[in-house]
């Protein structure tokens, strides 16, 4: 089918603190579109301040789908996101509206755009067997096994990387196919006319300043109390994906007494800047991308022109 004849879907990507939400809300008010959040932190309930979740006022202006859909104790994968996002996109299109996907979790955007490899889910029994073999014979022996069944993965995975080594062996024992073979197979790409935008300040120092300002505002809004409430739960810990979100980990460690308040602020801001750097690295290699400068006057007009 001709791409131009397919229903239109708009991506608005960008690093943290670049102004994505504000621009998306403007577009939602001016254009017949609905917002889908593409953010691995916004999915969690009770993580509002540190994730910069849209306020009640902002959500009234432009409701966001796929926020507050998981408890922080639960996991959520790129495959989960793809399935949920496809369902939301179909609903929005059936209403005669344009889906506007907004966020900074590039892995989610990539999974949605390109599809995912059909890897099997984890099998705790097989995983335990692999661990028992490693305890008995060492990871080097298991790496030799991997080299026999999947030399490409064995070249890429170091014997001292037990998590990835175990997963490669687990995939083979479950499916009978190597990790290399399965990752060459992708699910169907997104069947829509996707128009992609990225927004960021022209100068990195501006983004760094925005990140610092925003984190200090979060502290004024009660971020430490928010983390303290999460920390008080018996079922949350720092190994969970939710608690690995930038800011939350550093604040948790501060509450544990690992460092003082000023150090926590420095570490949280530095971690957020590193996240922004990774996001920009993804975006610089992203194909078919239209760039917008944060705060530029013509951004809304440009978006509306492409959304017609």
Curated annotation (Swiss-Prot):
Protein name: tRNA dimethylallyltransferase
Record has Cell division as a keyword: no
Reactions this protein catalyses: adenosine(37) in tRNA + dimethylallyl diphosphate = N(6)-dimethylallyladenosine(37) in tRNA + diphosphate
TM regions (residue ranges): none
InterPro entries: Dimethylallyltransferase (IPR039657), IPT (IPR018022), P-loop_NTPase (IPR027417)
Organism: Shewanella oneidensis (strain ATCC 700550 / JCM 31522 / CIP 106686 / LMG 19005 / NCIMB 14063 / MR-1)
Function text: Catalyzes the transfer of a dimethylallyl group onto the adenine at position 37 in tRNAs that read codons beginning with uridine, leading to the formation of N6-(dimethylallyl)adenosine (i(6)A).
Gene Ontology process terms (BP): tRNA modification
EC number: 2.5.1.75
Site (Interaction with substrate tRNA): 105, 127
Cofactor(s) the protein needs: Mg(2+)
Gene, per the UniProt record: miaA
Gene3D superfamilies per the UniProt record, alphabetical: 1.10.20.140, P-loop containing nucleotide triphosphate hydrolases
């Amino acid at each position: 089918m001709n791409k131009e004849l397919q229903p239109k879907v708009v991506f608005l990507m960008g690093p943290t603190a670049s102004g994505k939400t504000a621009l998306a809300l403007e577009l939602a008010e001016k254009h017949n579109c609905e917002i889908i959040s593409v953010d691995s932190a916004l999915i969690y309930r009770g993580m509002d301040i540190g994730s910069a979740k849209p306020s009640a006022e902002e959500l009234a202006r432009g409701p966001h789908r796929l926020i507050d859909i998981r408890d922080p104790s639960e996991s959520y994968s790129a495959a989960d996101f793809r399935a949920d996002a496809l369902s939301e996109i179909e609903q929005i299109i059936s209403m005669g509206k344009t889906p506007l996907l907004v966020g900074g979790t590039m892995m989610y955007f990539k999974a949605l755009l390109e599809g995912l490899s059909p890897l099997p889910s984890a099998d705790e029994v097989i995983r335990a067997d692999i661990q028992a073999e490693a305890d008995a014979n060492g990871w080097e022996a298991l790496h030799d096994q991997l080299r026999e069944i999947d030399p490409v993965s064995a070249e890429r995975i170091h014997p001292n990387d037990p998590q990835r080594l175990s997963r490669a062996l687990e995939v083979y024992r479950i499916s009978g196919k190597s990790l290399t073979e399965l990752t060459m197979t992708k699910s169907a790409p997104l069947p829509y006319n996707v128009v992609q935008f990225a927004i960021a300040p022209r100068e990195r120092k501006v983004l760094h300043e925005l990140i610092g300002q925003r984190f200090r505002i979060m502290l004024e809004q009660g971020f430490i109390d928010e983390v303290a409430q999460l920390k008080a739960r018996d079922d949350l810990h720092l190994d969970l994906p939710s608690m690995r979100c930038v800011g939350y980990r550093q604040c948790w460690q501060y509450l544990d007494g690992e460092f003082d308040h000023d150090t926590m602020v420095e570490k949280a801001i530095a971690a957020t800047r590193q996240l922004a750097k990774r996001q920009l690295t993804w975006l610089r290699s992203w194909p078919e991308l239209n760039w917008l400068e944060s705060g530029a006057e013509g951004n809304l007009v440009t978006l509306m022109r492409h959304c017609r």
